[in-house]
Structures are given as C-alpha cells and as structure tokens.
Amino acid sequence: MRFYKVLVPMIESNLENMTTTEKEVAQFFLKQVTVEDLSSEMFSNQLHVSKATLTRFAKKCGFTGFREFLFHYREMMREK
C-alpha cells in the first residue's frame, strides 16, 4: 500500500522535470515490476540506459541516488 501512497506520487510529481529516457525508467517502475535481481547493472541492461541515467532519475525523485531508490522500492514492494 505504501507503494501507491509514497513512491508513485514521488515519481509522478517529478515526471515533467525528466528527460524522455528518464520518463521511460519512471514508467518501468510505475508498472510495479517485481524482479529478483535489483541491481543498477540489471536495470541499465534491461532498460538500455546508462547507470548515470538511473542515478539522475532517482535524484529527480528526491533520493540521494539509485541505491537509495532501490532500497525504498524493494521495501515498498514487499509491503504491497
């Protein structure tokens, strides 16, 4: 439930400030994808984006970096 109350609004409220590539990353996470391997390497390969893009996306969502974003994403997906 926290996923819908916390993470989704954080992503959606920052969409207008994102590049097209960052918006593609956002859409991936808004689909509530559950994956086994939650590493930046896996995401950059799967989404065909650089690790820097993942970091910029996370920072625009209010996190210090992609690791912090993944930590919260993982926690919220568990609670869902």
Where are the language model's segments positioned?
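HTH-adjacent hinge/linker in prokaryotic transcriptional regulators
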Residues: R2-V8, S13-Q27, K31-V49, T53-K80
